[in-house]
């Protein structure tokens, strides 16, 4: 069941759901708007001949931060990682779904490629997979609304929520845009 604005506020008031920093004006009828942080991970296109999910490629991305008061410019066809300004903490009976903002989608900005689902028990910044499918550069301003977090109540609490040792939670507690750890899904060679 998708949580309403009333349900979201009740979960926050009870301390079960965490969104920090929280601004009540960001609560929408069935979601909470989230904002863009100031850190980005850009791909180093000359470090490797290709991306191999089975290999640890630590120099695949570089962390960058625009100067204070300046935007990050995302060029057509470019893909970077960003993150939410907010740290989100979900209890073991709520899952999240990150959706883009309609106004930004109409400009050609995609906020996630495939990973818009947030497991119950997750705690951390939500990494954004930002793509510009427009024909012109898009300026991304730290602090701007970048997406909306929808919350869904599970039929029962997760037996092994994200962060428990049983599920191999690679991104629990992540801070800022976190690069892929897909290599951990492969047997070490």
From Swiss-Prot:
Function: Bifunctional enzyme that catalyzes both the deamination of dCTP to dUTP and the hydrolysis of dUTP to dUMP without releasing the toxic dUTP intermediate.
Alphabetical keyword list: Hydrolase, Nucleotide metabolism, Nucleotide-binding
Pathway entry: Pyrimidine metabolism; dUMP biosynthesis; dUMP from dCTP: step 1/1
Name of the protein described by the UniProt record: dCTP deaminase, dUMP-forming
Oligomer and partners: Homotrimer.
Pfam families for this protein: DCD
Superkingdom assignment: Bacteria
Gene: dcd
Annotated positions binding dCTP: 101-106, 119, 127-129, 148, 162, 174
Cited InterPro entries: dCTP_deaminase, dUTPase-like_sf, dUTPase_trimeric
Species this chain originates from: Rhodococcus opacus (strain B4)
Catalytic activity: dCTP + 2 H2O = dUMP + NH4(+) + diphosphate
GO biological-process terms attached to the record: dUMP biosynthetic process; dUTP biosynthetic process; nucleobase-containing small molecule interconversion
Similarity comment: family membership: Belongs to the dCTP deaminase family.
Molecular function in Gene Ontology: dCTP deaminase (dUMP-forming) activity; dCTP deaminase activity; nucleotide binding
Sites annotated Important for bifunctional activity: 116-117
CDD domains according to UniProt: trimeric_dUTPase
Active site: residue positions: 129
EC number: 3.5.4.30
